[in-house]
């Protein structure tokens, strides 16, 4: 794997985490618009990461509200 690909994945991961946090805060996120220009491989990877981070953010928010 070349360095450009690693940086690209890190950037996509950061974006997926950021959009998930926005979603958990109640801000609408149009994931179709976000991923619209991605090729299928990157879109699939991004959506899986986004779903994971949405789940984590929702759990964290729920725990925060319990305490």
Swiss-Prot record:
GO terms for biological process: negative regulation of bacterial-type flagellum-dependent cell motility; negative regulation of single-species biofilm formation. Gene3D superfamilies: Glycogen synthesis protein GlgS (1.20.970.20). InterPro entries: GlgS (IPR015065), GlgS_sf (IPR036295). Pfam families: GlgS. Major determinant of cell surface composition. Negatively regulates motility, adhesion and synthesis of biofilm exopolysaccharides. Belongs to the GlgS family. This is Surface composition regulator. The lineage of its organism: Bacteria, Pseudomonadati, Pseudomonadota, Gammaproteobacteria, Enterobacterales. The gene is glgS.
